Amino acid sequence: PGLIVDRYGDTLSAQFLSAGTERWKATIADLLLQATGLARLYERSDSGVRKLEGLEPVAGWLRGSGPTEVTITEHDWRLTVDVAEGHKTGFYLDQRDNRRLFADTVRHFGYQRVLNCFCYTGGFSVAALAGGAAHVTSVDSSAPALVRANSHVGLNGFDVARHEALNADVN
């Protein structure tokens, strides 16, 4: 796709990945803000795929300004997303339904211990704890992602002793 847009609370995060969307970026940005009623759009056009289109990487506020960390609510869980950092637009929103399904699965089968490999910022770890897991081990090669995963556990009121974060390469 040439355009990816995610909404995190009061902030849009967008990737303009093709020459066509780049050409119309200002118009697209204005229309997105008009359609959503928001005032902030952070551009995360820093993907290597832009080079295939002859475009340089770009990241920063396209419209508005302010802190890049946003707190969102997914199901009953609170999560923080930094639209300036991390993968893609900042978080894997497309996994929202899977995180809910995973919490329900943990609850249904009574899983007590969960290993979350490639955990990124711990969305599935929070889901496992919300589903009733007694302990979750989260593994990722990114230390900053694990810091955020730990903060998500505490942000949702879970005992941090029920969560272990391991900085390691699962491969």
Language-model features, listed with the residues they occupy:
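Non-transmembrane, interaction-prone segments in cytosolic or luminal domains
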Residues: 10, 48-50, 62-63, 155, ...
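Rossmann-like S-adenosyl-L-methionine
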Residues: 66-171
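Non-catalytic substrate-recognition/targeting regions of SAM-dependent transferases
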Residues: 1-6, 23-92
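Carbohydrate-binding surface patches
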Residues: 11-16
